[in-house]
Amino acid sequence: MEHYSLAQLSKALHNREFSSVELTQHCINKIQSNKDLNAFISLDEDQALKEAQSADLVLKSGEGKPLTGIPMALKDLFCTKRLNTTCASKMLANFQAPYDATIVTKFKQNGAIIIGKTNMDEFAMGSSNENSYFGSVKNPWDRERVSGGSSGGSAAAVAGNLVPFAIGSDTGGSIRQPAAFCGISGIKPTYGLVSRYGMVAFASSLDQAGPFAKSAEDLAMILHCMAGFDSKDSTSVDRVIPDYSAEIKNPVDKIRIGLPSCFFQPQVEKGIQDAIHDAVKLFENLGAEIIEIDLKLQPLWVPCYYVIACAEASSNLSRYDGIRFGHRSKSASTLIELITNSRSEGFGNEVKRRILTGTHVLSSGFFDAYYLHAQKVRRLIRDELITTLNSVDVILGPTTPTTAFKLGEKIDDPIQNYLADVFTVAANLAGLPAVSIPTGFENKLPIGLQLMSKHFSENRLLAIAHHYQQHTNWHLANPNKQR
């Protein structure tokens, strides 16, 4: 059953081929037998099995929804009343939220079973999932390599067949990069399509929740459940949500694919370049028109992103002071010492680095030179991408410049870690939807293909990704067989 698509799982559950209890117990067993992946921070076995029993009764009555009885995992920055929400940080190691995030409520209403919460880079800051207070996540394809970050636990859980699907967040590539490293599919929706209420903030103008699954078809099914207006989120957009599952099956004709030359630089591994060119040839053989495009501002993507992201992180994380909630230092005799020591003890090195960077660029002496300038550049980047997407349906390229690197290889070189996001951050800066799907292997490690499209064009984006997966088998590869 672990190799079923979500649609197949749903059909099998509705046809009573196996029960939700059996499926949930199977997932629990897989999680327990793959603890070395370190994909999960918390597991809610008893409650998951209780909910599975209830789901079986609903399914028996014939009133089940598409996700009824299907287990799932949540990145540990979505608030849940039952389980702690740690953000993989000592600062929130014992924090239990008083409410559920909006997407948690939506999944519960649609009958999905939250089996546990996954490991991540602390406060979603990282590209390798080595910055977690609870230890690094291992890649199911090679346990000596990273799973990607910051949603590495969710990606590893799906790639390792521990759960059928999982939810992550994407601030600069934190869904797409782990999806690429782990050989699965993942989408960052348009900013505002999915509610951020109850998702602990890293950089509020960049953060967006999205799903991990094996295929674009599965992503469509999950996204339909997640998307929609939420009055509790001031950035949520009120618009009609298409039936993504139905629309990906529509014929995909006359695709115009933009291919940026800047995506094929020397620092991009040759095996990745070859795999992307093979994908382009396949699209061309299927009738797509390939258009060479020039993204002149691409060299500014990463510096612009890190100025803005760190500035917003500095502001958002100022609330963790040891007074209202979170870690409280025991070695303090004054208020200033309490705040200083609580933050020094509670935050890890990467989080401290980004807070310091953000505080610096927001300071009175550097605000205009860095933060204000970055915001102006962000607008130019957005305008360039939107103008380009007026002449093409999607922008195609590699998700990452390398395959998954070894654990510890880049941990002392933050710049190299930041450059892992070189192709992904633009979608966040512009608020555009982007999907990563598997497109081959290099030295037995997965390669990801990224497709980026116009605002709120997830239906077209997923249809093109699904079209590609109907003519390839990369998304069906299994790390357990590879090993």
From Swiss-Prot:
It is an enzyme of class 6 (ligase). Gene3D superfamilies: Amidase signature (AS) domain. It catalyses: L-glutamyl-tRNA(Gln) + L-glutamine + ATP + H2O = L-glutaminyl-tRNA(Gln) + L-glutamate + ADP + phosphate + H(+). InterPro entries: Amidase, Amidase_CS, Amidase_dom, AS_sf, GatA. Pfam families: Amidase. Signal peptide: none annotated. One of its GO terms (biological process) is translation. One of its GO terms (molecular function) is glutaminyl-tRNA synthase (glutamine-hydrolyzing) activity. Keywords: ATP-binding, Ligase, Nucleotide-binding, Protein biosynthesis. Its EC number is 6.3.5.7. The active site is at 75 (charge relay system), 150 (charge relay system), 174 (acyl-ester intermediate). One of its GO terms (cellular component) is glutamyl-tRNA(Gln) amidotransferase complex. Allows the formation of correctly charged Gln-tRNA(Gln) through the transamidation of misacylated Glu-tRNA(Gln) in organisms which lack glutaminyl-tRNA synthetase. The reaction takes place in the presence of glutamine and ATP through an activated gamma-phospho-Glu-tRNA(Gln). HAMAP family: GatA (MF_00120). Belongs to the amidase family. GatA subfamily. Heterotrimer of A, B and C subunits. This is Glutamyl-tRNA(Gln) amidotransferase subunit A. It comes from Legionella pneumophila subsp. pneumophila (strain Philadelphia 1 / ATCC 33152 / DSM 7513).
